[in-house]
């Protein structure tokens, strides 16, 4: 039996849901490689949720596998998810809960997305829906404009890094300076996102969780922010997965200030950003209640938001 290589996995992804603008077809053929079954509509969310639950219990049927894998997904990740077509006919990602989750990961990602928007961070169109009493997060694909496809590049690919390599935000700022269509504005936006990650303890900010969109001959721009997940300190220490400066990733307002020059920012501007983001993130409880989070979960998540860095950030400038 032949061992599958990287090309096999690349070609095994559905053309309809393939990330970015890469498409493949056989020499001499006009039709792009695609499965016989299309992406399910959003009305299938209940069924998809049941399928993911059976998959996680190793109780899936052949029909379950056909439903959830036929459209394919090139997005990866450790959480259960599926591609769906939303009510406005847009390709979207549905993120599902796990039975053993200590708290609703999807609900708190919605909280983070709302806070991010209010802090001035660009996010995808998103919606939290309840299916059979469980929260499912819908996130619209930002590499699609109708039927048009926008080339996408992860930060890992942009830096030529490999899995397990930390990388750093200054390196991403350098990449924007070299290849960016709006380098100065995106460097500031990138800094804003680093500050936000520090203040909400978004510690899974690895290089696959940042991306760039191609703007033709102008170059690349930052994609909308995605996979924003506040994490309580008892689950993971407040250390980012990507370095804040060239060497250090520990969440710290002092480190944010000292690293600001890498993003082309004067310290006064950086402090204004830090204070502004803190004024937003301090409202996290109100936003959590907006989305229907239970009080027990709000208490469970407190350490992700309430820490010395928040107090310090509110006092800078």
Give residue ranges: language-model regions.
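Phosphate/dinucleotide-binding and metal-coordinating scaffold of catalytic cores
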Residues: 1-207, 211-317
């Amino acid at each position: 039996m032949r061992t599958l290589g990287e090309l096999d996995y690349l070609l095994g992804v559905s053309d309809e849901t393939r990330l970015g603008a890469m498409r493949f077809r056989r020499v001499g053929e006009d039709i792009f490689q695609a499965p016989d079954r299309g992406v399910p509509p959003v009305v299938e969310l209940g069924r998809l949720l049941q399928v993911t639950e059976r998959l996680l219990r190793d109780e899936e049927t052949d029909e379950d596998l056909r439903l959830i894998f036929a459209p394919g997904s090139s997005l990866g990740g450790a959480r259960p998810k599926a591609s769906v077509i939303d009510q406005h006919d847009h390709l979207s990602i549905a993120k599902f809960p796990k039975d053993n989750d200590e708290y609703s990961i999807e609900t708190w990602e919605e909280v983070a997305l709302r806070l991010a928007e209010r802090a001035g961070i660009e996010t995808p169109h998103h919606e939290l829906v309840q299916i059979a009493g469980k929260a499912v997060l819908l996130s619209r694909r930002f590499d699609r404009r109708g039927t048009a496809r926008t080339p996408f590049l992860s930060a890992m690919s942009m830096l030529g890094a490999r899995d397990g390599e930390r990388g750093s935000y200054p390196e991403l700022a350098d990449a924007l300076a070299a290849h960016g269509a709006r380098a100065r504005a995106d460097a500031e936006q990138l800094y804003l996102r680093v500050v936000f990650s520090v203040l909400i303890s978004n510690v899974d900010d690895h290089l696959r969780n940042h991306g760039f969109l191609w703007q033709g001959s102008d170059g690349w721009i930052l994609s909308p922010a995605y996979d924003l997940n506040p994490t309580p300190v008892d689950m993971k220490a407040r250390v980012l997965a990507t370095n804040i400066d060239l060497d250090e990733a520990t969440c710290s307002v002092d480190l944010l200030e000292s690293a600001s020059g890498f993003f082309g920012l004067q310290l006064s501007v950086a402090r204004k950003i830090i204070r502004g983001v803190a004024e937003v993130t301090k409202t996290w409880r109100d936003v959590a209640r907006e989305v229907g989070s239970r009080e027990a979960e709000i208490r469970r998540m407190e350490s992700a938001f309430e820490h010395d860095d928040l107090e310090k950030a509110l006092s800078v400038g």
